[in-house]
Amino acid sequence: MGQKGCPIGFRTAVTKKWRSLWYGNNQEFGKFLIEDVKIREFLKKKPSCQGAAGFVVKRMSGKIEVTIHTARPGLVIGKKGAEVESLKAELKKLTGKDVWVEIAEVKRPELNAQLVADGIAKQIERRVSFRRAMKKALQSVMDAGALGVKVQVSGRLAGAEIARSEWYKNGRVPLHTLRADIDYATASAETTYGIIGIKVWINLSEKKAVPAANHAGAASTAAA
């Protein structure tokens, strides 16, 4: 039943780091968590963040620091930093707090599950054959040095009247092995026949557990 759980949540604080780093008491926790969700949803809709692989939110003394992991940092920064300043202003208006935006470049987008899933979704929306898009993604991921990759698409594939799921796998993708560094992401493609769901698992390597000093603790950190 390993396929029923989220590989990221399963490994958080073991081999994966938290995506939200802050402390909140009983009164603040829910408020901070909802605020994190709003920040992420806002950034996902911004054209400059379309190539973003993920967002990390940190809080310290009334301020918020958002790190945007992207394969296209120039698009997020904008001309002379104009886009970053615009994001800061809009996030401040959204949260009512000072927001600092950091940009982290994704060096190898072929090994990032979110970027691979988004790439497949865009191809399906452009009416590329879903099988062709999946096989191309598998090949590029394996060529980049992954130990294994699995891609699954679900929905009215090729306009079929009955929805179904199809998946392709290459290499080794263990689901119960905690030391396996599994990157996982989902995406959706909006087609004339309906929504096509995409899931991607990438086995990057085997790694040691995250040091205890880096653990934020379940009570003090939320993984939104």
UniProtKB/Swiss-Prot annotation:
Domain of life, source organism: Bacteria
Domain annotation KH type-2: ranges: 39-107
GO CC, alphabetical: cytosolic small ribosomal subunit
HAMAP family linked: Ribosomal_uS3_B
Name the record gives this protein: Small ribosomal subunit protein uS3
CDD domains: KH-II_30S_S3
Entry's Gene Ontology BP terms: translation
Assembly and binders: Part of the 30S ribosomal subunit. Forms a tight complex with proteins S10 and S14.
